Curated annotation (Swiss-Prot):
Residues 28-48 are annotated as: Disordered. It is found in: Nucleus. This is Mediator of RNA polymerase II transcription subunit 14. Keywords: Activator, Nucleus, Transcription, Transcription regulation. The lineage of its organism: Eukaryota, Fungi, Dikarya, Ascomycota, Pezizomycotina.
Length: 1105
């Protein structure tokens, strides 16, 4: 296919050499491409000389050479056909391969479905029809596309039939152009030759004049000089002449000539007047005549701006002639107008040349310079998208009606500045009319433009809370002359800085980040926004990325575990986070935290914030499968507006941050627990629980009244609870850090006791390691170590109630004279008031209700029933006689509403009786020890039975209330048949006990009564009577005599008395213990004693009998 011969300089180097460059002698006699192609079939071409006779061959050599054949841009038509055919073949193979693979898949499905019982289903037939339609459509599209290609080849083939003529036409055109070039070159050389021959021309010789000169020796045609040169003037004469001219000029300027306002700055000297126009020119004029109407003549002229140069040569002559003509016709006013307009035009021309030179440097693609009449336009940042900016420097008429007139009618150079298609004030641009510099003017305008952009960005960035509150530094440097001095400097984090500059030549925003690797995220160029929006967007993105990278780097260094956002349900995050926080977010976990807690770091221009997020506990993350997304339940912002909490990041600060986040998790889980309960008041409110400066975790203040104690956490004793609280209602919960060994959170709870209890704090803290009391004061502190994310409210309430119960028991003991010597939350060890060797202990046994105790602690709102149901037990040492009534005392403790006070009082009341019974039962005898042995049984704390097995006698000892005193009553409970066997003993009992009165006791019907302090004497007298009777019986049996009823008094009474018994034998009614003294109402006490005695008797009878 023949190509196209391009016309013009871009197609060939010169018109005269086109044929020489593409002339091929070997193929000069052939057609293009070696032959003529008709529909793709080439035929051998015939030379024009074929068929001629040999006689004509010689004549052909005299013909001019054939035209040079042009082959530029030609290529064979068969190559194009081969290429199209090959491409069609390749595309067809690809299409068949694709359809074959799809057909194999469809055939496999068809074979499987055909094996079924009913054959191919209708659904499959529909799918197969669709597949076949798609294949046919693809084949049709392929054939259409290929057909279009071959149609193009057909058109080219038909056109190639006339290619021979077109090729010849191209050769003729090239030949004509070559000849035209030769003709023009010949004319050019002839013209140059004619001009050069002017110098070689010589005039014809003047023979007549030459002969006259040779003969006469002179020339008559040459006349001599008719004037004489003046004599040289003396210096004094010159001075006098110049002074005269000065006076003449002064008089003319003062009296006759009109001096325009612009030429009022002049001075006369040296016979001339010098007019000075600042920033424009300085001109010297003088006069040639004394006449007032004589004109001024130009003496000298000088420009007062730089760069400038006076006209030289012919141009200077033209200027001088024009100035003198103007002085003659228009005077000084016309001269000023001429020179003023000339200077203005000259200045614009100088600035234009400077701008053109500047545009040919590195400003070439970003500066457009145009000159319209006398207005110079400099458009800078021409390739920057958005509004255009340019400077116009032109001549202003100076008319008073103009808005920018200076008050005079003199024209002047005016600078107008258009910034982003809007005209703005150009008063701040450095437009120096003395030192002309297009670069300085351009740099000044660009500096002010950059300052405007950066100031707008500065104001936009400073509106963010991160910078307006002083969390990070932001500053700006501005200049009206140098664009490089205009930049915006800000802190992205404590360790990274950002300098924002605008490139002066192109207007592109340049961000210089330290450290520099962060700039790899600044790849997005927003072309549809203004410069300010672009800067704010890029700075916001870089600042957030910088903060995220820095936090992630240090978090990984200290062992935090980052969590990918893809593992968390995005919808759940959208529900609990604001939209601004979702753009830049990092999720972390710590090994010491519960799986349901996360820490989230968000970065924005308003500040960097830390959040704690609680996941849904129904599906703990540790048990989820790898594909299940985590569900965020609630989020808590813990940093608030304070952004300078961490300072410069390093590993130590992140270790402190881990502790602070753990503390905030503890605070939040405790607050959530308190909100679930709803009965405990706390301060501050949840919205104010934020991290404080220096990573201080806020404390929680509780107000826990005894009456408002949550019912589900109240420990209710079956035998009653303290009626008042011994602990102040205000508590403070403070987080103290992480235990390095266990990884548990350390939480301290501070409180105060309501009253001072002697030695309570020292004894309690001695046995409990995680509690401490003030040495001199009522304050105490409780230490808790729990996993991070586990609330301490439930254990705290349990501890407080335990402490309150212990304080209640201790106060009750002290009121009864008992002395505690060891305290713990579950046991109190005490000693008796008078006999220190007798000791006991009261223990508290707490049992949880149900098997879901831990779930109730985590979800207290699911139940309103008390979780803990404690019981109180009492124990005594081996030497203590109260060990026999342990069961009875325990029953009273857990069944009576005032069980503790009643038990302590019973211990004091029963002590003399039990000591005496223990001693009489522990007596040892040498002879017939079994006859004298006495036994007693404690059926309850108020009922005892003394037995003498040898005689089969029984005496019941019971406590009862008489008026306001507790008395012991001894009654004979021996059956009648046994009594009838010992009439003398009955007689003795009647005389010495029933109808008698002893030391602190007196007899009643079939018994005796004694106060609690004197019951030991009554029991001892009874025992002595029984022992003397048995001794008498033993002696009578040895002699064979009947039994005598005379008693024996051979024993000392003092050895059986208890240590605190009064030996004088008087009944001390004033010191007798009373229940009314402790509780104030004797009837109520009697009733309670009887109810307790009945309950204890039933229990003891079952246990013993």
């Amino acid at each position: 296919m023949p190509g196209l011969a391009m016309d013009g300089p871009s197609a060939m180097a010169s018109r005269a050499t086109v044929a020489d460059m593409h002339y091929d002698p070997a193929s000069a006699s052939q057609q293009a491409n070696g032959g003529i192609y008709r529909n793709g079939i080439g035929k051998k071409s015939h030379s024009p000389v074929d068929g001629l006779h040999d006689s004509h061959i010689g004549c052909l050599h005299e013909l001019p050479p054939e035209l040079s054949h042009i082959t530029l841009g030609f290529f064979p038509f068969n190559n194009l056909i081969s290429r199209v055919v090959q491409q069609s073949w390749n595309d067809l193979n690809e299409l068949l391969n694709e359809m074959g693979s799809s057909q194999a898949y469809q055939t496999g499905i068809s074979s499987q479905l055909s094996a079924t019982k009913n054959g191919m289903s209708e659904k499959f037939r529909g799918d197969q029809a669709t597949e076949n339609s798609l294949k046919k459509l693809r084949i049709l599209e392929f054939t259409h596309s290929r057909r279009a290609e071959f149609i193009k080849l057909l058109v080219l083939s038909q056109w190639s039939r006339q290619a021979n003529e077109v090729s010849r036409l191209i050769d003729i055109q090239a030949f004509i152009r070559m000849r035209s070039g030769f003709y023009e070159a010949a004319l050019f050389h002839i013209g140059n030759m004619k001009q050069n021959l002017i110098v070689a021309q010589l005039a014809n010789p003047d023979l007549k004049t030459a002969s006259h000169v040779l003969s006469a020796g002179k020339i008559d045609a040459l006349h001599g000089l008719e004037f004489l040169s003046p004599r040289p003037l003396a210096p004094s004469q010159v001075l006098r002449l110049l002074r005269g001219i000065n006076k003449l000029i002064d008089m003319r300027l003062a009296l006759h000539d009109h001096v325009p306002d612009s030429l009022q700055n002049y001075f006369v000297h040296d016979g001339r007047v010098t007019f000075i126009v600042p920033n424009e020119f300085e001109i010297d004029l003088s006069v040639a005549s004394a006449a007032p109407s004589a004109q001024f003549f130009l003496v000298d002229m000088k420009f007062l701006f730089f760069p400038s140069s006076l006209p030289k040569g012919r141009l200077r002559s033209i200027v001088d002639h024009q100035v003198n003509s103007t002085l003659m016709n228009a005077g000084l006013v016309g001269c000023f107008n001429l020179l003023h307009n000339l200077i203005l035009t000259h200045k614009i021309t100088i600035l234009f040349k400077q701008a053109i030179d500047l545009a040919r440097t590195y400003w070439s693609e970003h500066l457009r310079v145009e000159l319209f009449h006398r207005t110079l336009v400099l458009q800078y940042w021409s390739k920057k998208p958005g509004g255009k900016s340019w400077i116009e420097i032109g001549v202003h008429s100076g008319l008073k009606g103009s808005p920018q007139s200076t008050g005079t009618t003199t024209s002047f150079l005016q600078l107008r500045w258009f910034r982003d298609n809007e005209e703005v004030s150009a008063t701040d641009i450095d437009f120096n009319l003395t030192f002309l510099s297009a670069k300085s003017i351009l740099f000044s305008a660009i500096s002010l433009h950059i300052t405007h952009i950066l100031r707008t960005a500065f104001e936009a960035l400073r509106q963010n809370r991160l910078y307006c509150l002083g969390g990070l530094y932001i500053g700006m440097s501005a200049s009206s002359k140098e664009p490089g001095d205009c930049y915006l400097e800000l802190q992205m984090t404590q360790t990274s800085h950002l300098d924002i500059m605008v490139e002066a030549v192109s207007g592109d925003t340049v961000l210089r980040v330290a450290p520099s690797p962060i700039t790899r995220y600044d790849t997005e160029i927003i072309v549809d926004r203004g410069s300010v929006e672009d800067i704010v967007e890029r700075v916001s993105r870089l600042r957030c990325v910088s903060a995220l990278e820095e936090v992630e780097r240090y978090a990984k260094a200290v062992g935090w575990m980052p969590l990918n956002l893809r593992h968390v349900n995005l919808e759940s995050l959208k529900r609990i986070f604001p939209p601004s926080a979702l753009r830049s977010m990092l999720l972390f976990r710590a090994k010491c935290w519960e799986p349901s807690w996360l820490a989230v770091f968000t970065s924005a221009m308003d500040g960097d914030n830390w959040w704690i997020v609680q996941l849904q506990t129904q599906n703990p993350p540790a048990l989820q499968s790898h594909w299940r997304l985590l569900e965020a339940q609630r989020a808590k912002l813990i940093t608030g507006w304070f952004t300078g909490w961490l300072g410069r990041l390093h590993n130590a600060s992140f270790s402190s941050l881990l502790s602070a986040l753990s503390g905030m998790i503890m605070v939040q889980c405790n607050v959530d627990f308190l909100n679930e309960i709803g009965a405990i008041h706390f301060f501050p409110p949840p919205k104010d629980l934020l991290l404080q400066p220096c990573l201080r975790v806020p404390s929680i203040y509780l107000r826990l009244r005894h009456d408002d104690f949550p019912s589900q956490f109240r420990t209710i004793f079956s035998g009653g609870s303290p009626r008042r609280s011994f602990i102040d209602e205000t508590f403070r919960i403070s987080y103290k850090g992480i235990d390095q060994q266990s990884g548990h959170a350390i939480t301290m709870v501070y409180g105060r006791l309501m009253t001072d209890i002697d030695m309570f704090g020292a004894l309690y803290a001695k046995s409990v390691q995680d509690i401490a009391f003030q040495p001199k004061g009522r304050g105490f502190a409780i230490l808790f170590r729990t996993p991070v994310g586990t609330p301490i409210i439930a254990p705290l309430l349990e501890r407080l109630q335990q402490m309150n119960n212990i304080a209640f028991v201790v106060e009750s003991m002290k009121s009864q004279g008992f002395q505690p010597h060891s305290l713990s939350p579950l046991r109190i060890k005490f000693s008796y008031p008078t006999q220190g060797e007798l000791r006991g202990s009261i223990k508290f046994i707490y049992h949880d209700q149900g098997s879901h105790f831990e779930s109730k602690l985590l979800f207290p709102a699911t139940t309103t029933k008390p979780i803990l149901h404690p019981r109180i037990g009492i124990d005594f040492n081996y030497q203590n006689p109260h060990r026999r009534i342990t069961e009875s005392l325990s029953t009273i403790l857990n069944s009576h509403k005032d069980g503790m006070s009643l038990v302590l009082e019973l211990i004091n009341i029963t002590l003399p009786l039990l000591v005496t019974l223990e001693r009489i039962c522990a007596e040892e005898y040498i002879d017939n020890a079994w006859c004298f042995r006495a036994q007693y049984t404690a059926r309850s704390a108020r009922l005892y039975q003394i037995r003498y097995p040898f005689l089969r006698y029984r005496f019941n000892v019971s406590a009862s209330q008489r008026k306001s005193y507790v008395v012991w009553v001894i009654q004979n409970s021996t059956p009648g048949p046994e009594r009838s066997k010992h009439p003398s003993l009955e007689l003795r009992l009647k005389d010495q006990i029933y109808n008698s009165q002893g030391d602190g006791w007196r007899g009643i019907n079939q018994g005796a009564m004694a106060y609690s302090a004197n019951v030991s004497r009554l029991v001892f007298d009874l025992h002595q009577l029984m022992k003397s009777y048995i001794s008498q019986m033993a002696k009578s049996n040895q002699r064979g005599e009947p039994t005598d009823s005379s008693p024996s008094a051979g024993c000392e009474f003092g050895r059986y008395l208890p240590k605190n018994e009064n030996k004088k034998g008087h009944i001390q009614t004033t010191t007798a213990p009373t229940l009314e003294h402790a509780y104030g109402n004797s009837n109520m006490v009697v009733q309670s004693v009887r109810q307790g005695e009945a309950a204890a008797r039933d229990v003891d009878v079952i246990a013993i009998d």
